[in-house]
């Protein structure tokens, strides 16, 4: 890889994306992982390292990358080692009041956990590659807009290839055995119990949940409204009959915690509707 890096620096410095691909020339991607990269110097003044991080995940060079509120790429091992971790997954397209309320209220609950020290806590906003490619090809401007907005909230942003939640937890567990929590809405939580997501695992959903909940993990559940306007929480959510007893095990063992101090008016906010309104306004101005 060192020889490839020297070659790329000399001959592909004006094409950073191609330079990245040349790093694996005649190398197997399974043999080595690049989990962070930073371009600096006069020749790379116009290169945004967040976009280069995105390329690492997109090209299968690593499973996840992280950058700090300043937009600088950071090593996951250094940032997460022996830390308490609160993670929020979303498309954040756009960031809505629901996202902010879920973040703020779940953080309040997390910091009240018995063994959580605020000074040793990391909050992660995670966007999966599938969320970035939901419209087809990745729109780099759209990605940068989301990244900058999330960075402005003062916490770490992660881009990952972890479609399933258990893979995210499994990844984070490499670096810490401290308290971890996932903040999510009821609808996302119900999807976690869909067995179709785990057909590639020999142990199926049991194996996935074993990986997800074996550590000090809790799920902070943000409520939603059903079609009749009823508020849905962990106490009245609907699951497939086969999953009910399975769910009760985690519920009664304190692994699922409701966020009660939420803003009821925010439950009528849906990011897709907001995005549609933004797009409609853009078309009017055009």
Located regions from the model:
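Nucleotidyltransferase catalytic core that binds NTPs
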Residues: 1-284
């Amino acid at each position: 890889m060192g020889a490839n890096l020297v070659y790329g620096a000399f001959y592909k410095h004006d094409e950073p994306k191609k330079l990245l691909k040349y790093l694996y020339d005649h190398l197997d991607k399974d043999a080595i992982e690049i989990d962070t990269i930073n371009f600096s110097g006069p020749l790379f003044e116009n290169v945004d390292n967040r976009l280069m991080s995105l390329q690492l995940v997109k090209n299968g060079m690593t499973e996840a990358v992280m950058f700090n509120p300043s937009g600088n790429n950071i090593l996951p091992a250094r940032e997460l080692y022996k830390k308490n971790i609160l993670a929020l997954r979303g498309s954040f397209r756009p960031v809505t009041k629901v996202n902010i309320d879920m973040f703020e209220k779940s953080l309040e609950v997390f910091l009240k956990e018995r063994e959580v020290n605020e000074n040793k806590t990391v909050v992660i906003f995670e966007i999966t590659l599938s969320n970035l490619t939901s419209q087809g090809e990745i729109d780099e401007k759209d990605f940068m807009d989301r990244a900058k907005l999330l960075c402005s909230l003062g916490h770490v942003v992660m881009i990952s290839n972890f479609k399933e939640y258990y893979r995210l937890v499994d990844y984070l567990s490499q670096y810490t055995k401290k308290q971890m929590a996932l903040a999510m809405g009821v609808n996302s939580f119900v999807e976690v119990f869909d067995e179709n997501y785990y057909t590639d695992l020999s142990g199926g959903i049991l194996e996935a949940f074993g990986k997800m909940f074996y550590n000090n993990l809790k799920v902070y559940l943000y409520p939603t409204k059903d079609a009749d306007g009823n508020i849905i929480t962990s106490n009245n959510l609907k699951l497939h009959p086969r999953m009910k007893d399975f769910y009760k095990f985690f519920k009664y063992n304190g692994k699922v915690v409701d966020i009660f101090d939420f803003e009821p008016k925010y439950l009528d906010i849906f990011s897709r509707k907001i995005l549609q309104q933004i797009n409609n306004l853009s078309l009017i101005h055009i």
